[in-house]
Amino acid sequence: VASYSGSEEAWKQLCERDDIDLVYIATDWKHHAAMGVYAMEHGKHVAIEVPAAMTLDEIWQLINTSEKTRKHCMQLENCVYDFFELTSLNMAQQGVFGEVLHVEGSYIHNLEDFWPEYWNNWRMDYNHLHRGDVYATHGMGPACQVLNIHRGDRMKTLVSMDTKAVNGPAYIKKQT
């Protein structure tokens, strides 16, 4: 087992090894794309937790690097592999619902049990500064599978909505 530490860039040593085929990236979001690009440029396939990138430019960097290096770059969207999602997909593919014309997706995750540690976590830094859903693929991934998006069909329009924060602020208020 190898360990890499001592600097912000120590992870690059892993990517530079000759005996590694794939790099699994499960760090904070702001490092995902840069790590993925670096790993592919050093001959590694890449598996990246969501979100794989935070900007369209980073997405294109990942795509272009993957195509240039001929290395796989896979976003690991765990919500498409859950029991409910796989069961629903199978039912749709078997025709249980008839022809599927419309789907809606969402990601609801009650974090109340985690708030004491989570509130000051790096994951919340983004949410403090921005609105929107950084885990949009959790809801859209299963919906796209049912509709065969990028498997014979494509998405023309996407509507994304965001509500005000309710549970987190209410929990914090209750604790203080």
Locations of the language-model features?
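Short, solvent-exposed turn/loop segments enriched in Gly/Ser/Thr/Pro and often Arg
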Residues: 28-31, 53, 79-81, 109
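Short basic (Lys/Arg) and small-residue
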Residues: 50
